[in-house]
Regions:
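An N-terminal boundary/leader segment
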Residues: 1-113, 362, 366-369, 560-566
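Short helix-loop capping/hinge segments that flank enzyme active sites or metal/cofactor-binding pockets
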Residues: 42-52, 126-152, 211, 327-341, ...
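A short helix-breaking turn/cap at a secondary-structure junction
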Residues: 44, 255-355, 404-408, 560-566
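Glycine-rich, small-residue loops and helix-cap segments
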Residues: 71, 127, 133, 176, ...
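Residue-level signal for inorganic ion chemistry
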Residues: 82, 104, 290, 338, ...
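Conserved small-residue hinge/capping positions at short loops/turns
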Residues: 114, 118-145, 180-187, 364
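Glycine/threonine-rich flexible loop motifs
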Residues: 142-161, 350-351, 470-476
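Short glycine/serine-rich loop segments
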Residues: 168, 172-298, 490-496, 534
Length: 566
C-alpha cells in the first residue's frame, strides 16, 4: 500500500466514526483551539446536554446500577445519555475507534423489557453502559487496535471467518452481567507507548488540558471517562497502560495481577509473550465503581472459560478484614503502615508530582498511619528487564502489523524495528532474571516488618505513576514508575490527588531530588498548568480486594486534604 493509500484509508475510517454519530449529536460550531480553551470538561461539555442527561452521566456506576436494577431509571434512558456524551467527547478529544449506539440502545430496550416482565435485573450490572478499549472483539464491530492494516480485517487477516462474529470472553461475561456495550476507545498502534496516537484518529488529547496527552495505551478510555462519556470501562496494562491514563485523567484504575480478569479472545501486541503478561482492569471516576465491576466479573467464574484465569473468586473476607484494620486505626487501637517512594533513582519527578506525594504523606500521618521511606532493590533493573520483554521479538510484531498498510510509526512508540529476536535460551535467562528480581523485592518487602512498628510488613506502597503529570506530547520520559509493578506482577491502582498549578508548582534550577543532582530535568509550569496529578497505590501479588478497599478509604481522605491545601 502506498503512502497516499494508507493515509486515505485511515482518513476514511476516521470519517466513518464521525458518520456513525447521529446528526443531532454532531457539533455545529467548531471547538475553539486548545490554545484558547484547554479544559473541555464540566461546564463546557454540559452546554450540549440536558439537565437530565447531566444528572445521569455524572452519577457513578454504583449509583447508576442502584437506579436501573430497581426500575427507577430505564436502561434506554441511561444508555442514550451516555451515547450522547460519548459522541460529544469524541468530537472534543478524539477518543473513540468504534461507535455502535443503535445496537446498544436495542440491547437496553431488551433489558427494560426483561425487567418489566420479571421484576428483577438481568445481573449486577443491569443497564450499566460500559466502554471498552479497542482490543476487545464485539460481534458486528471492527477491531483495528490503531492499525490501518487491520481495517476491514480480523486482526490483519483478510477473509477470516471470525470477522464480525468473534467476541472476547470479557465481552460475553459483561453481557451476561447486564452491561450495555456501546463504544470502543482509542489506542496507540502497537500499544507500546504512554500516549495515544495512531494513523486513524490521530492524537487523543487530555480533556482537562488539550495541549497535553490523555496517556496510553488505554488513553481513549481515560479521556472518555474523564469527560463522563462512560461511567466505567476496561483497559489493559503491560507497562502502565491502565494506570497512566487513569492518573492523567483524574480517575481510578486498577492493574490486577495476571489471571484475575479473563484475557481470552482479546487482541494484543506481542501475542504469546508470557514473561510479563498484559492484564485487564477497569477504569472509573470512583474506587467503588472499580470494585463493582471487578467483583461482578469474578462472579462469572472466568477460570471456566479462560485457561489462564486463576480459580480465585472475589474474597469478601479480605475486604472485611481490611475494613476492620481501617476501623481499628480510626479508633487508635492499631495502625496501618505504608511505604512512600518519591523517586525511583532513575527519573526525577516534576513539582506537581512531588506535591501530590506530600499530600498523600500528610494524609497518612493525619490518619495515624506509619510511613516509612521505601528503599527497594534497584528499579533500574526492573526497567531493563521490561525493555528486554518489549524487544524480545526484535521488532517482528511491530514491523508486521505496520507493514500490512505501510503506514508510518509514531515517534512515541517503544521498541526496536531492527533487532534480533531472542533465542529460547535467552528467553529462559530473562525469565530467570525476572524471577530473581521478584525474589529480591519480596525479601525487601518482608524486611519492612522490622521498621513499621506494627509487627507486619508495610500494607502498601505509595509512589508516582510517572515523573510528570499528564504529559506534553512526545515527552513521556520513563515507564519505570509503573513498569516495575508489571515485572513483579503486583496489584496496583491509580488514585487521583490534585492538579498542577503554575503558581504553586515551581522549582529552582539547582534543586536536587533526594540529595542528588540530575542533568536532565525539563519542566514548564505554564504548559502543565491544570494537568491532573495522580499517585500509585501498590500492593503485593493478588491483593486486589485489599487494595481496592484501601483505595476507597484513602482516596476520599486524600481528596479532602488536597482540597484543603488547594
Amino acid at each position: 500500500m502506498t503512502g497516499e493509500s494508507w493515509k486515505l484509508k485511515g482518513e476514511a475510517k476516521r470519517q466513518s466514526i464521525l458518520n456513525a454519530i447521529p446528526k443531532k449529536w454532531r457539533l455545529e460550531c467548531p471547538v475553539p483551539p486548545a490554545t484558547e480553551l484547554r479544559d473541555v470538561t464540566a461546564d463546557y461539555i454540559r452546554q450540549y446536554l440536558t439537565e437530565r442527561e447531566i444528572e445521569i452521566t455524572e452519577t457513578d456506576a454504583v449509583a447508576i446500577v442502584e437506579q436501573t436494577s430497581t426500575g427507577r431509571w430505564s436502561a434506554v434512558e441511561v444508555t442514550e445519555a451516555f451515547c450522547h456524551r460519548a459522541a460529544l467527547a469524541h468530537q472534543l478529544v478524539n477518543c473513540l475507534h468504534e461507535v455502535f449506539f443503535e445496537a446498544a440502545i436495542k440491547d437496553a430496550k431488551q433489558q427494560d423489557e426483561y425487567f418489566a416482565n420479571h421484576k428483577t435485573p438481568i445481573g449486577p450490572l443491569h443497564g450499566l453502559p460500559v466502554s471498552l478499549k479497542d482490543q476487545f472483539h464485539v460481534k458486528d464491530v471492527e477491531t483495528t487496535m490503531g492499525y490501518v492494516g487491520w481495517i476491514n480485517t480480523f486482526q490483519g487477516n483478510q477473509n477470516d471467518p471470525r470477522s464480525g462474529t468473534e467476541e472476547s470472553e470479557l465481552v460475553r461475561e459483561l453481557r451476561n452481567l447486564g452491561a450495555v456495550l456501546y463504544c470502543k476507545t482509542s489506542v496507540p498502534a502497537t500499544l507500546m507507548t504512554g500516549e495515544t496516537i495512531n494513523n486513524i484518529i490521530n492524537y487523543t488529547w487530555n480533556p482537562k488540558n488539550r495541549l497535553l496527552s490523555s496517556g496510553g495505551s488505554s488513553g481513549g478510555e481515560g479521556a472518555l471517562i474523564a469527560l463522563r462519556g462512560s461511567p466505567a470501562g476496561f483497559g489493559t496494562d503491560i507497562g502502565g497502560s491502565i494506570r497512566i491514563p487513569a492518573g492523567f485523567n483524574f480517575l481510578y484504575g486498577i492493574r490486577p495481577s495476571a489471571g484475575r480478569i479473563p484475557y481470552q479472545g482479546a487482541a494484543n501486541s506481542l501475542d504469546g509473550q508470557s514473561t510479563v503478561l498484559s492484564v485487564i482492569g477497569p477504569i472509573a471516576p470512583t474506587a467503588r465503581s472499580l470494585m463493582l465491576l471487578f467483583k461482578a466479573v469474578l462472579g462469572q467464574k472466568p477460570w471456566l472459560y479462560d485457561p489462564l484465569a486463576l480459580e480465585l473468586p472475589w474474597r469478601d473476607e479480605v475486604v472485611q478484614e481490611t475494613r476492620e484494620w481501617i476501623e481499628k486505626a480510626r479508633d487508635g487501637a492499631s495502625t496501618l503502615a505504608f511505604g512512600i517512594m518519591k523517586y525511583d533513582g532513575v527519573a526525577p519527578v516534576h513539582p506537581p508530582i512531588a506535591r501530590g506525594l506530600r499530600i498523600v504523606e500528610k494524609t497518612l500521618q493525619r490518619l495515624g498511619h506509619r510511613v516509612i521511606k521505601w528503599k527497594p532493590p534497584s528499579h533500574a533493573v526492573a526497567i531493563e528487564l521490561l525493555d528486554k520483554v518489549f524487544n524480545m521479538d526484535g521488532g517482528v510484531d511491530l514491523k508486521y502489523h505496520l507493514g500490512l498498510s505501510g503506514e508510518s510509526r509514531a515517534p512515541q512508540v517503544l521498541g526496536t524495528e531492527h533487532g534480533t529476536p531472542m533465542t529460547a535460551s535467552e528467553i529462559s535467562a530473562l525469565n530467570v532474571a525476572k524471577r530473581e528480581y521478584q525474589k529480591l523485592y519480596m525479601d525487601y518487602w518482608n524486611s519492612t516488618a522490622e521498621v513499621t512498628g506494627t509487627g507486619r510488613p508495610v500494607d502498601a506502597l505509595f509512589c508516582p505513576l510517572a515523573p510528570h503529570a499528564a504529559v506534553i506530547p512526545n515527552e513521556y520520559e520513563s515507564v519505570g514508575y509503573t513498569g516495575f509493578v508489571n515485572v513483579l506482577d503486583y496489584t496496583s491502582l491509580a488514585i487521583p490527588v490534585t492538579f498542577a498549578d503554575k503558581k504553586v508548582d515551581v522549582r529552582s534550577s539547582n534543586e536536587s531530588v533526594d540529595g542528588s543532582e540530575h542533568i536532565k530535568w525539563d519542566y514548564d509550569a505554564e504548559s502543565y498548568d491544570g494537568a491532573p496529578v495522580g499517585v500509585q497505590l501498590v500492593g503485593r501479588r493478588l491483593q486486589e480486594e485489599k487494595m481496592l478497599t484501601l483505595a476507597e478509604y484513602l482516596g476520599k481522605e486524600i481528596a479532602q486534604d488536597a482540597k484543603e491545601r488547594a
